[in-house]
């Protein structure tokens, strides 16, 4: 089955064509980073307007790159939530229009399930069940995954997501946006062991990054923001390491607690080079099979949405054209919508 995926949950407008849920034929992403960087974060109104401008060209480019016509598409999958409602509605409206005009089946997809499913576009794929860490700007969750649509939430952030912890640190230090990318790049020049930031490593599988953020703020108030690039690199390297340590250790702990020797790491923050490196180191030590999509499939994209869509469409699932966007949508109850 050839599926067109559409994603517009935040600040990337994306479209992709995927065959049989495994073969990526095209993957087009229009980023809005340049539009939002001056504000230090995503402005919902601007995001919605930019999606309107980009969505049709992006879909046409995805079809062109795949060597396809719209008549070749057999089903449409679109992100339904969670996300910014104004942004979601752009992709959802276009998907509905295409489905209606071409008489194609349509399925609305949970954004986080898409992130988890991105791994099935890799050469090496896990078998069910597995543990999944979904780590992004808005989410930091650990799931027990028994199959498509079958998720049990094991742990989540109690305050900021890991991506927010990166972005807020970058804003505090005035080093640019998006914070995770800037910190990842700069941290490579620093020594992560020169400073020691706190790790919230309680018995629970839940996360908390508020104490880490406060610790950085106290450090800056006491010592000032580093003026020398070398000192700044040491600071962000140590801060990044504190985030990475917690993400890795709690995820591997979840795998051991549930006797599941397979871990999938996904979401935008999964493109962080130190996180990938440390997960590889620790998973080898713990004899756990690690699966991480390539960076281009970690950030928001429509290919991952098409993968989930293909699975649902092959089961005969489809949505009414009356479906609406869902701004808040727990993944472990997503199946109740189907």
Swiss-Prot record:
It comes from Syntrophus aciditrophicus (strain SB). The keyword rRNA-binding does not apply. Keywords: Acyltransferase, Cytoplasm, Iron, Metal-binding, Transferase, tRNA processing. It comes from the Bacteria. It is an enzyme of class 2 (transferase). Coiled coil: none annotated. Binds 1 Fe(2+) ion per subunit. This is tRNA N6-adenosine threonylcarbamoyltransferase. Its EC number is 2.3.1.234. GO terms for cellular component: cytoplasm.
